[in-house]
């Protein structure tokens, strides 16, 4: 997940699901978590990241967002719409989780798309894994200082890592933003779960019931996704 805008069109969101108890316009200090990804497919780890961040950082809503067009690659196993169906199914029990498709795929563009959808007072936290967090911080931006300044003017980062440990590289360009980069420890049972493992198990004809919500496992079985 990288961050510098490359498109001329204004970033926008296509809503799939609005959280029944999400952020409202009259909240004084609302906090929004944003979890972007391909969700190919959604797993217990994705949901645990969102739920843990919401609890630890008092997030009033977590928005799951998929890019309409990926900046680096496209999943071959499932279409955007198929992944949206699985994700919407997984989010149904969660009244503070929303779902949208972003017209653009880069982090800063997603932040720009939020501006027209949420109150100006909302504080935004992007939720990322440790690998994505490292890429965001160390990406070879054309103008790194300017890009990082614009990013952290719009959002903080919550970085999920093993044991809640996060090592921020000692680089002068990152020093002003250390207080905006927050470590988060995932539940131990979710740390080894990934969409890659789910797909590998399905191709091998193995069970995935402990890796994804039951309704997602059932939908995948019915559709035959990821089996070849």
Tell where the protein language model's regions lie, with residue ranges.
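Nucleotidyltransferase catalytic core that binds NTPs
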Residues: 1-228
């Amino acid at each position: 997940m990288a961050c510098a805008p490359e498109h001329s069109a204004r970033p926008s969101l296509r809503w799939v699901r609005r959280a029944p108890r999400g952020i409202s316009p009259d909240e004084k200090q609302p906090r929004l978590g944003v979890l972007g990804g391909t969700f190919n497919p959604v797993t217990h780890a994705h949901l645990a990241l969102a739920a843990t961040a919401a609890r630890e950082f008092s997030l009033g809503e977590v928005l799951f967002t998929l890019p309409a067009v990926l900046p680096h690659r496209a999943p071959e196993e499932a279409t955007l719409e198929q992944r949206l169906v699985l994700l919407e199914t997984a989010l149904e029990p969660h009244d503070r989780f929303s779902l949208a498709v972003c017209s653009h795929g880069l982090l800063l563009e997603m932040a720009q798309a939020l501006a027209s959808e949420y109150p100006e007072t909302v504080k935004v936290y992007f939720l990322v894994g440790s690998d994505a967090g490292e890429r965001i911080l160390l990406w070879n931006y054309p103008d790194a200082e300017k890009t990082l300044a614009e990013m952290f003017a719009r959002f903080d980062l919550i970085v999920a890592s093993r044991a809640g440990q996060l090592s921020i590289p000692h680089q002068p360009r990152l020093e002003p933003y250390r207080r905006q980069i927050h470590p988060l420890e995932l539940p131990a049972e979710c740390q080894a779960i990934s969409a890659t493992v789910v797909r590998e198990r399905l191709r091998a004809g193995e069970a995935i019931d402990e890796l994804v919500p039951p309704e997602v496992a059932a939908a995948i079985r019915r559709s035959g996704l990821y089996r070849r």
